[in-house]
């Protein structure tokens, strides 16, 4: 019976027979085609006139208006830095608790399931919740802290579990306090990589401010999101947008320089004079890191000191969650796709499949074209283009292109695909550039084309990273589509926004809880796969 499904390649490894792989490929292809048919509409030819008018309006800014750009930008810097630092610190502690290779199962599993549960809440829910409890600056700080804590925990945990832990176990076995051993052997030894992660998360959180402004979060993103809301005023967008883009480009350049000259590890030099020079460089690097830490700490403390911690409605949280978990069963048996949350989830899944298919194809293309296989001019030009795409607010792109596409969900998918592909393309380029140059040069010397090298060497070599990218992009796609539901990007996201605005928290819970279960099941399956608990993935499909 086993031979019907698998063939043996070694004593411990099997592979699926080719016809089952073919059947699986056909099923996946059919699902993708159905998802595209279900979610894509044609172009609205008459909408091109509105598109050109909107484009002209965008580049005809209202220069007489006082935008208070400095005040809004400084406000954003305060709460993003503060929230990112607080979230990162909490994430370090939770990553220590949730790492299966560090903690016993009875500690790691419940803690990880707890973070998965909290992460399953759409970010809109807690943004709206904080808005009802606190003033704008505290709401913004808490939202960034919440977001950074939960998502940083996920990635830092994976990083810790993939680290060399021999020294940690040696120290912890010598009756040294376990956390102290963890700090000395894992955190300190990998400080450069953790700093890099913090800087990249800071940069990502600044980009997220425009999206979070949809949910009422204050800051410079508010100056962009508000004119793009109900009554679109494109002439008010350009000046704050250019300010934000300029700041993001400055931030990207700063992160690049810090990565290149401060946080990048250097190999040990053999020559005495080179060693002395290396030690001198390390001293300067330490000074720069201390200065960076002081600047970030200063912004964090300054923000925390000036915050107003007054709670507007102390009883609101208890009342909210009491209603939130009182689900309406009539919704679950309705045949209307605009009412039944299960049908909404089915629709959301097809949207996510369409989105990640586009993201994966575009990111692979971007990563390939920006890699070392192409000329330096081509690579740098594309990297700069991807950088510009990443810093342009996705809300603006949606408003610009929406008139020329019949359905808003199609526009959202295209906009998110381009934005996400620009980010993931950068990661894929790094993975491709880290491949064995000797093998690539040898293949080029034998006359193999770039596409042949991509298909037969780069993709197979980086398959684990590509699969991780694919799985992460599906999870992120679901959450992004929910956020953009306010603009018609998804039914379920639109309903969450409507029910919160009307204070219909029971209906909100009825719509949100199935989505949370859906996300939790996906994360638990993904966790099991990554920890090799589901051996069929590793042994039969890999």
UniProtKB/Swiss-Prot annotation:
Annotated membrane-spanning segments are 23-43, 77-97, 114-134, 140-160, 212-232, 236-256, 287-307, 350-370, 386-406, 412-432, 481-501, 509-529
How are the domains described in the entry?
Composed of two homologous domains.
Q: What is its main location?
A: membrane
The superkingdom listed in its UniProt entry is Bacteria
The record's subcellular location field reads: Cell membrane
Q: Which positions form S-S bridges?
A: none
Name a GO CC annotation attached to this entry.
plasma membrane
Concerning its family, UniProt says:
Belongs to the binding-protein-dependent transport system permease family.
Q: Which InterPro entries match?
A: MetI-like, MetI-like_sf
Function per UniProt: Probably part of a high-affinity transport system.
* Keywords from the named record: Cell membrane, Membrane, Repeat, Transmembrane, Transmembrane helix, Transport
Give the classification, highest ranks: Bacteria, Bacillati, Mycoplasmatota, Mycoplasmoidales, Mycoplasmoidaceae
- SUPFAM superfamilies, from UniProt? MetI-like
Cited PANTHER family: ABC TRANSPORT SYSTEM PERMEASE PROTEIN P69, PHOSPHONATES TRANSPORT SYSTEM PERMEASE PROTEIN
The protein here is known as: ABC transport system permease protein p69
Q: How does it sit in the membrane?
A: Multi-pass membrane protein
- Give start and end of each ABC transmembrane type-1 domain: 349-526
GO BP field:
transmembrane transport
């Amino acid at each position: 019976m086993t031979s019907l499904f698998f063939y043996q390649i070694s004593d411990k490894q099997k592979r699926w027979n080719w016809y089952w792989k073919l059947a699986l490929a056909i099923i996946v292809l059919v699902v993708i085609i159905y998802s595209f048919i279900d979610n894509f509409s044609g172009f609205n030819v008459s909408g091109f006139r509105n598109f050109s008018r909107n484009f002209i309006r965008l580049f005809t800014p209202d220069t007489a208006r006082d935008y208070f750009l400095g005040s809004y930008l400084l406000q954003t810097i305060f709460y993003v830095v503060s929230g990112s630092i607080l979230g990162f610190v909490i994430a370090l502690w939770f990553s220590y608790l949730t790492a299966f290779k560090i903690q016993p199962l009875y500690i790691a599993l419940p803690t990880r399931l707890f973070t998965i549960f909290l992460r399953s809440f759409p970010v809109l829910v807690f943004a709206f919740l904080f808005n009802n409890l606190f003033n704008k600056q505290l709401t913004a700080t808490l939202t960034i802290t919440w977001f950074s804590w939960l998502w940083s925990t996920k990635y830092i945990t994976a990083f810790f579990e993939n680290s060399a832990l021999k020294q940690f176990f040696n120290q912890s076995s010598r009756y040294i306090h376990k956390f102290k051993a963890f700090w000395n052997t894992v955190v300190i030894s990998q400080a450069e990589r953790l700093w890099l992660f913090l800087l990249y998360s800071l940069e990502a959180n600044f980009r997220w401010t425009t999206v979070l402004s949809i949910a009422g979060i204050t800051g410079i993103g508010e100056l962009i999101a508000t004119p793009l809301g109900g009554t679109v005023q494109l002439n008010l967008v350009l000046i704050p947008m250019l300010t934000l883009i300029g700041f993001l480009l400055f931030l990207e350049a700063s992160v690049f320089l810090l990565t290149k000259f401060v946080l990048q590890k250097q190999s040990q030099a053999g020559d005495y004079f080179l060693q002395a020079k290396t030690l001198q460089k390390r001293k300067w690097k330490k000074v720069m890191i201390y200065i960076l830490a002081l600047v970030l700490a200063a912004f964090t403390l300054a923000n925390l000191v000036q915050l107003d911690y007054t709670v507007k409605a102390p009883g609101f949280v208890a009342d909210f969650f009491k209603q939130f978990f009182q689900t309406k069963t009539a919704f679950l048996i309705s045949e209307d796709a605009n009412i039944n949350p299960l049908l909404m989830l089915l629709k959301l899944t097809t949207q996510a499949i369409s989105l990640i298919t586009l993201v994966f194809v575009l990111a692979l293309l971007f990563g390939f074209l920006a890699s070392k296989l192409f000329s330096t001019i081509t690579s740098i030009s594309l990297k700069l283009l991807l950088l510009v795409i990443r810093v342009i607010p996705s809300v603006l792109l949606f408003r610009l292109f929406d008139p020329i596409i019949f359905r808003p969900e199609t526009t959202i998918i295209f906009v998110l695909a381009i934005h996400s592909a620009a980010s993931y393309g950068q990661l894929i380029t790094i993975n491709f550039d880290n491949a064995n140059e000797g093998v690539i040069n040898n293949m080029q010397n034998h006359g193999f084309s770039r596409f042949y090298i991509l298909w037969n060497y780069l993709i197979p070599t980086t398959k684990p990273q590509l699969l991780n990218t694919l799985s992460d992009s599906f999870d992120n796609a679901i959450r992004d589509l929910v956020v953009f539901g306010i603009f018609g990007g998804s039914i379920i996201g639109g309903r969450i926004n409507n029910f919160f605005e009307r204070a219909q928290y029971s209906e909100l819970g009825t719509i949100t809880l199935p989505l949370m279960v859906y996300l939790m099941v996906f994360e638990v399956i993904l966790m099991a796969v990554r920890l090799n608990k589901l051996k069929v993935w590793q042994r039969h499909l890999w």
